[in-house]
Design a protein with these regions (language model features):
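Beta1/beta-strand and adjacent pyrophosphate-binding region of the FAD-binding site
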Residues: 40-52, 224-229
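AMP-binding/adenylate-forming core of the ANL superfamily
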Residues: 190, 315-319, 358-359, 363, ...
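Glycine-rich beta-alpha-beta "Rossmann" dinucleotide-binding loop(s) and their flanking helix/strand
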Residues: 194-215, 302-346, 364
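Rossmann-like NAD(P)H-binding beta-loop-alpha module
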Residues: 220-256, 260-261
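A conserved FAD-binding loop/helix module that cradles the flavin
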Residues: 361-418, 505-512, 516-523
């Protein structure tokens, strides 16, 4: 026999006497000992834990820079058993299916309005959603994206490990595979990109009977009358498209809707939804959810202002009370990485954690926008800094976003409240106005919540601090203005831009009334 030292462990070679044992050790070396580390080198230059948008963007850019890369991804089923493929929240249970459901709701409205435009619709009463057909179409699209993503990793020669990764030490990760087997690997650098999952309130029946945004897009039966607990953008978007599809929706609001967004615009969103039939229960917290013999759910809640309890029966209860980072399953203490206890989020100002070679991108970051494009760009820039010699940092300011409620809300920059807090009310000017989308005229749609404003510095040339827009296709409207904000656009430049007529986006170029003036912000004419 002879000996060999690997990773500081002395191994006895028994080839003379036990050849079969030696063959087994060689064939199953990773399972027995983990990867070989020789002369301080590692199997991979980068291991990315998490196969969502940010992690994948980082991995692909690292490969482009010549790095050896592995991606570990595993989806723990939701409490209701929902699971999905590679691609993260956005592709599977977030942006993509949400936008498709939103589009389905808008199409239903358009069919009803088509009569006003001269289309002959056989029977408006017959216009209703086929929920199984919708979810099947949505899921088929998602599966196609899962497949394309997997093939892309293969073509780029990124090692994909479909296992739940956790740290053993700062450079070593073990992945637990679906069949329970283990695979170890070492990496010089690690990126944590595991994202987050919906939070469930600690009340009776929440875990057992309620669904979340993880489940709604593949729900096997029509949701029926639905209670949405939570009034963040996820809750309002879900309540909005469900109600528009003909499923009555109610929303429990604990404090304010769309916390963190401009509150004047948030009120317009909820006003519009109420006028469309969504019920809002303000200042309320859930108490319990009970399953009845009929299969329906009895929900109880308390109004914190009146201290009165209320209850109602629903077919579905959807929890949208926030999200937590999936870092607890990573065994971060073994790597020395610190995180925020309550949320599990990682503090990393430049995506670098307190352990120099371990980074984080996406929804796991404390104090950063939980948005797919943010994670993608941050991941890409991080890979360029790690392997391409770049020094460019992610700019988290002036990130545009849109809430896809029935009447959409797009925003970029500061809310009016934050602008006043930072600069003082006397140093802020707010230009605002209502407008009438041309396509709303003939079907006589409600226009009283179609509104926009520009929050600027008061001193010339009045640099724009924030732009806010409630109306149709808000995301398409606000995207171009995000680039202008990046370039430091002023109010003078905005109003001297020639608009495209007739569009809703041109309304920003027509802003000329300030809140301070007290003048009527309603439009007098569409063409002057």
């Amino acid at each position: 026999s002879s000996s060999l030292t690997i990773n500081g462990t002395k191994m006895i070679m028994l080839s003379c006497y036990c050849p079969r044992i030696l063959v087994y050790i060689v064939d199953h070396f990773d399972e027995c000992l983990g990867p070989v580390v020789i002369d301080g080198t590692f199997e991979y230059d980068l291991a990315v834990i998490g196969g969502g948008s940010g992690g994948l963007a980082c991995a692909k850019e690292a490969i482009n820079q010549g790095a050896r890369v592995a991606v570990l991804d595993y989806v723990t089923p939701s409490p209701q058993g929902t699971k999905w493929g590679l691609g993260g929240t956005c592709v599977n249970v977030g942006c993509i299916p949400k936008k498709l459901m939103h589009q389905a709701a808008l199409l239903g409205e358009s069919i009803h309005e088509a009569v006003s435009y001269g289309w002959q619709v056989p029977s408006q009463q017959a216009i209703k959603i086929n929920w199984p057909a919708l979810t099947e179409a949505v899921q088929n699209h998602i599966k196609s994206v899962n497949w394309v993503t997997r093939v892309d990793l293969r073509d780029k020669k990124i090692d994909y490990i479909n296992g739940l990764g956790e740290f053993i030490d700062p450079h070593t990760i073990v992945a637990t595979m679906k069949n329970g087997s283990k695979k170890q690997l070492t990496a010089k650098n690690v990126v944590i990109a595991v994202g987050g999952r919906p939070h469930y309130p600690d009340i009776p029946g929440a875990i057992e009977y309620c669904i979340s945004s993880d489940d709604i897009f593949s729900l096997g039966h029509p949701p029926g009358k639905t209670l949405v607990v939570g009034a963040g953008y996820i809750g309002l978007e879900c309540a909005g498209f469900l109600n528009s599809m003909g499923y009555p929706a109610s929303v429990l609001v604990r404090s304010v809707p769309l916390r963190g967004f401009d509150q004047q615009m948030a009120r317009m969103i909820t006003n519009e939804m109420e006028e469309r039939g969504v019920k809002f229960h303000h200042r309320c917290i859930p108490l319990s959810v009970e399953k009845l013999e009929s299969g329906q759910l009895k929900a109880r809640w308390m109004n914190n202002e009146t201290q009165t309890e209320h209850e109602d029966v629903f077919d579905t209860v959807l929890m949208a009370t926030g999200r937590y980072a999936l870092t607890k399953q990573l065994n971060l203490p073994a790597a020395g990485v610190t995180c925020v206890n309550d949320s599990g989020k990682v503090v990393a100002a430049t995506e670098q954690t307190n352990v120099p070679h371990i980074y984080a991108v996406g929804d796991v970051l404390e104090g950063r926008p939980e948005l797919t494009p943010v994670a993608i760009l941050a991941g890409r820039l991080l890979a360029r800094r790690m392997f391409g010699g770049s020094t460019q940092q992610m700019d988290y300011d002036n990130v545009a976003t849109t809430v896809f409620t029935p009447l959409e809300y797009g925003a970029v920059g500061l809310s009016e409240e934050v602008a006043i807090e930072r600069h003082g009310a006397d140093n802020i000017e707010v230009y605002h106005g209502y407008y009438k989308p041309t396509e709303f005229f003939i079907p006589q749609r409600n226009i009283k919540n179609c509104y926009l404003k520009a929050v600027t510095l008061r001193e010339a040339p009045q640099k724009i601090l924030g732009l806010h827009f409630v109306g149709p296709v808000a995301g398409e409207v606000i995207q171009g203005f995000a680039a202008a904000m990046k370039c430091g656009i002023t109010m003078e430049q905005l109003v001297n831009t020639v608009g495209i007529h007739p569009t809703v986006a041109e309304e920003f170029t027509r802003l000329n009334i300030t809140k301070r003036s007290g003048k009527d912000p309603n439009p007098a004419s569409c063409c002057s």
